[in-house]
């Protein structure tokens, strides 16, 4: 699910984002539920990049060390579409069970 939400955030962004921006965005849209340790995002971002779903570029920062900016790739957008469909189907099935709809 972390991979899914990271791809979704980057897929919705018009500009590349660095880790802190991504973490803040998750806090905003997830109403705190998706908030977590920022450091936990970096291994997932690196894995997504290793699979070709993201690409990154390091750029200098005026306020500190260089920042690595991430953007979603075409392959990442395709994976995001597939994962959203799978998540929706899973969520619907779980909701049905939780609501006692299984007879």
Where are these regions (language model features)?
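N-terminal helix-turn-helix DNA-binding core of bacterial DNA-binding proteins
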Residues: 1-40
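Beta-hairpin "wing" of winged helix-turn-helix
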Residues: 49-66, 71
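Amphipathic alpha-helical dimerization/coiled-coil segments
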Residues: 75-103
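Conserved G/P- and acidic residue-centered "switch" motifs that form tight phosphate/ATP-binding loops
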Residues: 41, 73
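Short, hydrophobic-biased segments on the C-terminal half of alpha helices
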Residues: 42-46
């Amino acid at each position: 699910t972390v991979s899914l939400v990271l791809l979704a955030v980057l897929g919705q962004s018009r500009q590349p984002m660095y880790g802190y921006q991504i973490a803040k965005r998750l806090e905003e849209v997830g109403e705190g539920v998706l908030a977590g340790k920022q450091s936990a995002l970096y291994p997932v971002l690196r894995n997504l990049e290793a699979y070709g779903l993201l690409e990154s570029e390091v750029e200098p920062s005026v306020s500190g060390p260089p920042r690595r900016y991430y953007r979603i790739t075409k392959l990442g957008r395709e994976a995001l579409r597939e994962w959203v469909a799978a998540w929706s189907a899973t969520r619907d099935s779980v909701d049905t069970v939780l609501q006692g709809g299984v007879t």
